[in-house]
Structures are given as C-alpha cells and as structure tokens.
Design a protein with these regions (language model features):
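An amphipathic alpha-helix signature
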Residues: 17, 60, 90, 94, ...
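Short secondary-structure transition hinges
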Residues: 94-142, 153
Length: 211
C-alpha cells in the first residue's frame, strides 16, 4: 500500500509538471497561474502546493526533467574524447540538432526557456544555467578548433575562440529559428549543411580530407 501511495504521488507530480509545460508554452510563464495549471492537470491548487512550494518551484522542476541542447553538446564531447577534432565538431552538432528535432518534450521546454520566461529575480538561476552551459560548450568548441588549427591553421584574423563563438551562434540561431518557425525546415539536414559550409569556409578538412 505504501509503495502504491508513493507511485500515485509521483504520477500526480509528473502530471502537474506535464500540465505546467503545456500552460507555460501556451500562455508564457508570467501569465500562467497555478489555477490554470491545476485545471489543465485535472487537479486542485492544493495538489500543486502539496508537491511544489510555488510556481517558480514548479518551473524549476520542469527544467530539471530535461537536458538543454548545449548540455547535450557538452556531454557528447565527453563521449567522443578522441579522434579527429573537426569530425568531432560535425558529430556533436549533428547529434544535438537531431536530439532537439526528435524530442518533443525537450523542444517544448527549450521554447519556454528561450521565449516565454523573464529571467529576473527568482528565475535568475535558470539564466545562470544557460550561461554556464553556453560557456562550457564554447570552451569545448574552442578546444577542438585549436587542435584542428595545429594541422591546418585558421585564417589569421580568426582565433579558435572566435571560431567557437561563431559556430555557437550558428548552432543557437538554427535551433531558435526552427522553434520560432515551428519546424518550417529540416533542422538536421540544414544544420549539417550549414555546419559543413562553416567549417569548409575556414579551410578545415575532415574524414577523407574533404573540405
């Protein structure tokens, strides 16, 4: 009986987070009320307060259930710790864009985090999470650009860090525009072509020596 009660409580909690995702996506975080979320979940405000301190706590629980795209990228760099650095850059970009395109829940939460919340006061922790992930991802990109430059020097005017910032901007722009345009283009296909065009523009080679 105790186990069933614990399972029921977990199911209720997850149902409330699911409902919060839908309501936050529809109304934005600031305009969404706990009553809206309770109604969407078929529950009461009391049920929300049983599991969460307030709306911010509920929002944080929603964010904790997913891995942000840049966090996915950092994890993938760790999985591909050796080998051709340019091929690794291509693989990481392709992996993360594919993960975004195929995971509806992560995509919805990322849309909320990008477009439907104000990062002020109690929401500052989420902004800090974005900044930390962004910095770590850029550092990983710069590391591989530096390794690649040892074989084929980058243009004099572009340092490994600057190349990393530029590729990071391309990555962010692709995801943000894809979400904003509601999947109007093939994120994986366009992302792969854009990544290859960017790397080729730097004169970098990968695999069989393709530029």
């Amino acid at each position: 009986m105790a186990r069933r009660t614990k399972e029921d409580a977990a199911a209720t909690r997850n149902g409330l987070i699911d409902a919060a995702e839908r309501v936050f996506c529809e109304k934005g975080v600031s305009r969404a009320s706990l009553s809206d979320i309770a109604s969407a979940a078929g529950a009461t405000r009391g049920a929300i307060y049983w599991h969460f301190k307030d709306k911010v706590d509920l929002f944080n629980a929603m964010m904790d259930r997913v891995t942000l795209p840049l966090e996915e990228g950092c994890a993938q760099f760790s999985c591909l710790a050796s080998g051709d650095p340019v091929a690794r850059l291509r693989s990481v970009m392709a992996f993360v864009l594919g993960a975004v395109a195929s995971n509806a829940q992560a995509r919805r939460v990322f849309e909320i985090a990008m477009y439907k919340v104000e990062y002020v006061e109690e929401m500052a922790a989420i902004r800090d999470r974005h900044i930390a992930a962004s910095g770590a991802f850029t550092a990983q990109l710069a590391k591989d650009f530096a390794l690649a430059a040892e074989v084929s020097p980058l243009p004099v005017s572009l340092s490994p860090h600057e190349a990393a910032v530029a590729l990071h901007a391309l990555f962010d722009g692709l995801i943000q525009n894809w979400i904003l345009c509601q999947g109007a283009f093939d994120l994986v296909k366009v992302g792969a072509s854009a990544t290859d065009a960017f790397l080729s523009g730097l004169g970098l080679k990968w695999g069989d020596g393709t530029v």
